[in-house]
Amino acid sequence: MTRARGASRSSFDVLARSFAIGVAAGSRASLGLAPPLLTSSLSGPWGAVAKVVGALGVAAELTGDKLPTAGSRLEQPGPPIRMVSGAVGALVLARRAEAGVLFPLLLGAAGGAAGTWGGAAWRAAAVGRRPDWQAAVVEDAVALSLAAFATRP
C-alpha cells in the first residue's frame, strides 16, 4: 500500500507540474520551454548556448510585454503557440520524471489555455486601477513562480 501512495503522489506531482508549466506558458510563451531547458542537465558548449538562448528569450518576452506596441496574446497565433509551449514543456518534465506523457501533455496544453485567457482577464480587470506595466509585472511574478515550482528538483 505504501508504494501505491508514493506512486500516486509522484503521478500527482508530475501532473501538477505539467499544469503549472502550462499556465506559465499561457502567461509568457517562452516559459513553457525555457525553464525546463534551463534546469536540464545539458552540458558542453551546445548546452550552454541553448541555455543562454532560452534565458534571453524569457528576458526579451518579459521586456517586450511591457511595451505599448505589444499585441494581445489573444490574437492569432498567440493562443495555440502558448498551448503548444505548455504542452511541450509538460512533455519534457514528464520525460525527465520518467512518467507517462499523455496526461501531462494534455494538462500542459490546458494550462496554456488557462494562462492565456486567465492572464488576459487579469490584465483587463486591472485596466484603470493601476498602470498596465504594474499588472504585467504581477503577472510575470506569478508566471515565474509557477515555472519555478514546475521545474524544481
Regions found by a protein language model. Name each.
Residues 1-153:
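Short amphipathic, positively biased membrane-proximal segments
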